Amino acid sequence: MLNDVVRDAEGEKVFLLGNEAIARGAIEAGIDVFAAYPGTPSSEIADTLSDACRLLRGKMDFYMEYSANEKVAFEVAVGASLAGKRAMATMKHVGVNVAADPLFSFAYVGARGGFVLVTADDPSMHSSQNEQDNRWYGKAAKLPVVEPSSVQEAKDYAKLCFDLSEKFGLPMILRSYTRLSHASGVVELGKIPEKEFSRVEWERHPETDVVLPAHARKLKPILLEKLEKIERYFNSSEMNWVDEGDGDVGIIACGLSYAYTKEALENLNLNLPVLKLSSMHPLPERLIENFVSQMKKVIVVEEVDPFVELHVRAMGLAEVYGKMNGYMPMNYEYNVGRVETGIAKALGIKPSRDYEGIVAESQKLAAKAPPRPPVLCPGCPHSASFYAIRRVVDELGDAALPSDIGCYTLGINKPLEGVDITICMGASVGVSNGLAHVLNNKIIATIGDSTFIHAGIPPLINAVYNHADFVLVILDNSTTGMTGHQPHPGTGFRGCGEAGKAVRIEDIVRGCGVEFVEVVNPYNVRKMVDVLRRALNHDGVAVVIARQPCAILWSRARRREGKIVTYKVTEDCTLCMECVNTFACPALIFDGEKVSIDQSLCVGCAVCAKICPNRAIKPAKSN
């Protein structure tokens, strides 16, 4: 809870979400600058600090912003660190791909003020397009990676990483993941330091801060020396420890897998030695070697990639059981059952329960339940946009429909079927550039407003420059919807509850050189279809901005004012099924005999009334 995050009660125990605990750790560390681009499962860190910076104003002041993308967020934090201030940037795992360019260079430069990058990985891809393991970024960029094993450690290690960053002059990577970020646990609070936000004078350090080749050649050996020093620290750090046990079979458990391992051993009634690892890079070589050398067999438990397992195998000191020889799952996130099954298999015993049977039975039960696929919300303007796009595509006979990352990716589902390709943020525009030069078909790409600002502008400039012929529909719902309605530069709002200057998307588009630019409310289906037809006839890239606030925010505002007028299906309905079969708003219900509108779901967008060929849908009442 937010009140607990900002509570100045040292020693008190509270119940926090993992992401709230990370935010609290940053507060206890006396953070000066925070920057983020929202992305599940990291978003609540930024949201919590956005509220906290307002509530703590005058007691523990810091600057917080939602940045245009992850690269910008990382660079904002870099600037603060180089000025001697403590800074944190947070993002989901694929966001680090966007920030990778400055990440690798900043490793050479080094941190002055404490610098912490939080990457929230997503094993099992609950809300992501891949399952990448960002521990590899630490190895590739030669930066330390720390991985908490509990919500308490999430708070403690977030705070500790600032100290380590300043002690060793290194940017620190704190690796979270879905089951830590979105878990709740008891956290003992530390003290919130009292401080004012103060500006400082710039001090020049061109020999380290300007990574010319001549400087970089000198900086790399220094970076490697820093890594050696922090490895020595990790070898004796309290974040890693050995739980003594019986026998010559040991387990190395990484991060949250430690909790799964301890419960699995309890279920199996075993007392095996366990090395709990939270320093993922550089790995504590001496600590691992001392542990492994005492064992005949070592079971490695870690999520996503065999990162630690590869290292332990290379030592050649014991038989290793893990992902690479099929004892631990190579795919998806772990739980107690998966870990216990792997340990039992390595030991040649049976697990305490038939976990595979339990999973099979649960799948049978799930198959009997009514399907509940994710859908666009009632009144979502994206539904109206995709309906209009589908109308135009049906007139054409076919078209290529690249899309992007956001709520609107759900446009892939029937009956809208408005999404053919989704790769990454901004790729709808970039991919359309490529398709435009090789396809006979027309191309209609879709991208959200926040995603367009994040990564859609450079490929749009490329389309103008290289004369790529396609239509780009910017689905502008005036928020970053899928991650929790965070502000972006187009909204006029900023972090910490402050107002900002709204950047008009149509001005950006025209500034890129696009000649066909039209703004339309997608609830006006007839006009939306007309604009799309004209855009398709334009020679070159054409941009249609479909602007209507997110239905959730729009309906909340109108409910507060008592202005919602819902709609109902009248006796004039002929069961033509146009509304159900081609629009499919969740508020529309067909029970096998008649079509009706769920009054508790309807937000009064009136799109169903506009597309009904028999004018059988009318206003019902004011709520």
Swiss-Prot record:
The keyword Protein transport does not apply. One of its GO terms (biological process) is organic acid metabolic process. It catalyses: indole-3-pyruvate + 2 oxidized [2Fe-2S]-[ferredoxin] + CoA = (indol-3-yl)acetyl-CoA + 2 reduced [2Fe-2S]-[ferredoxin] + CO2 + H(+). Its cofactor is [4Fe-4S] cluster. Keywords: 4Fe-4S, Electron transport, Iron, Iron-sulfur, Metal-binding, Oxidoreductase, Transport. Binds 2 [4Fe-4S] clusters. In this family the first cluster has a non-standard and varying [4Fe-4S] binding motif CX(2)CX(2)CX(4-5)CP. Residues 593-622 form the 4Fe-4S ferredoxin-type domain. One of its GO terms (molecular function) is 4 iron, 4 sulfur cluster binding. [4Fe-4S] cluster 1 binds at residues 573, 576, 579, 612. PROSITE patterns: 4FE4S_FER_1, 4FE4S_FER_2. It is an enzyme of class 1 (oxidoreductase). Its EC number is 1.2.7.8. The keyword Oxidoreductase applies. It holds the Pfam family POR_N. Catalyzes the ferredoxin-dependent oxidative decarboxylation of arylpyruvates. Heterodimer of the IorA and IorB subunits. This is Indolepyruvate oxidoreductase subunit IorA.
